[in-house]
Amino acid sequence: RRFANGLPANNALLWGARGTGKSSLVKAIHTEINGDIAGALILIEVHREDIPSLPLLLMYLRDQKNRFLLFCDDLSFDAKDDSYKSLKAILEGGIEGRPENVLFYATSNRRHLMARDMIENERSTAIHSSEAVEEKVSLSDRFGLWLGFHNCDQNTYFAIVERYADYYGLKME
């Protein structure tokens, strides 16, 4: 809401177990904000394969009057993929800086966006293993907001929903 109203906001990484509603939450936020202020936020889905072309998109969006939420669903990287470096530069703002009218939200099953075995392999094979690992893990640090979605059983889920319903005064049947 802050971002849609022209105020600064953080890029966000929603990470956690599959099927816990990460993508649904991003889409619901977009719908909610546009329900309050029609057209306040334009959602653009970005595929991982499109990350290298993001600088061109940002250059175009920079001059637009609208606010944009770039959304990459199920983001992760494998050992042979170095496009995470491009994303890191984009999240940091690069030389030109991230446009004030653009935010980046991503969902992932991985907190650090890299497979654990990929990170551990860097530890075992690199000359300066801690530096190599830090470079790969630091991508997730570029997101100002991290939201973790943890698995829970059905009873715990129902308890969470009931507490929220009570808090917001919602009637449940």
Protein language model features and the residues they cover:
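Walker A/P-loop nucleotide-binding motif
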Residues: 6-27
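Conserved AAA+ ATPase "SRH/arginine-finger" region at the nucleotide-binding site
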Residues: 108, 124-137, 144-158
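AAA+/P-loop NTPase substrate/partner-engagement loops
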Residues: 32-68, 76-80
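C-terminal alpha-helical "lid" subdomain
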Residues: 150-173
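Conserved catalytic/switch belt of AAA+ P-loop NTPases
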Residues: 34-35, 59-63, 78-125
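Conserved nucleotide-binding/hydrolysis micro-motifs of P-loop NTPases
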Residues: 49-52, 75-78, 104-114, 151-157
